[in-house]
Amino acid sequence: SANSGADSAGIDSEDEPAAENEEVPEEEEKKAFELDTYLDHRDMTHRLYIYDMDYIEKAISFEKKSLQDFEEVIRQNPKIPDKFKPLMEEYCKRVFGKYPDVELRPFYQNLQSLEVVECTEDELLKVSWDVYSCGCYVKSENKIYVLKDKEYEEGTWDYQVIFHELSHCLRDSHYTDEDGNKVYIQFAGLNYYDVPNAEAINSLFAVSLFDYEENDIAYQMQSNAHKIMIECMDNYSLDDYVNHSLGYYAKQLDEYNQDDNYATTILTLMDEQYHDYYDEKTAENPEKYYPIYDYISNMYLGKHLKAGMSQEEARG
């Protein structure tokens, strides 16, 4: 559990409240353990988990790289087919232009050995386990799988697929270091994680790099919900997707909404709704999802409706 590794999870013992300090409520003490930072088990199981880029230097010691370094590493990598190289250089240009403060060293490290595999639908299904998949980044292999015979024109779905998979490659990195330790740098938190919500936020990050409005977004329903929520928030932006975990997002939602550990309840419901939709179960109990709509509506109205507004102003 997270508690048993408090120190290794990035909470120094001197930060813990003294036992005799009665003023600290138990919840607050507990909350200190809830945010995913890192777990360093290199001395026991030869594993290091980094959920928050504030701790990246536990894994990566080289200096930050320039855009030119990124372009060079893409050009030098023989496992990236030539047709993808200009696309990937363009992706890097946009990330550097739009998100100058995100941590990109894991991405640089991934790009050194990244392989892009053009495959058939059957081959893609074997790695993605998803019949609806158009592409897949497999962290354990550091490979992007995409369907063969696609043209990657800006504005097309296939263009979005490449940006989506590159965004996974930017955010997550699994590798073995020179001392034989397995290193996991990932958005998937220790204390909260699900696939649809993580995918939706990754999708939003990917399409935010376009210079046009993209309405047909992967994980559409969840993406739309997160788009509204993030636009309302003054304490979270898509930079934070790269720099922090999904648990951090939940914590920022709670802080923004002045809730006590409620965001993960909503995220769990959104995860269920996604799976119910594909299992054709959403009609069975539609009111089960009402808290999601209430939550998003309250955020939106709280942000945009002001006391004394006319109906016209409110509609605008």
Regions found by a protein language model. Give the residues of each.
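Auxiliary, metal-adjacent structural segments of Zn-dependent hydrolase domains
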Residues: 72-144, 151-153
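Charge-rich, solvent-exposed alpha-helical interaction surfaces
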Residues: 38, 58, 66-69, 73, ...
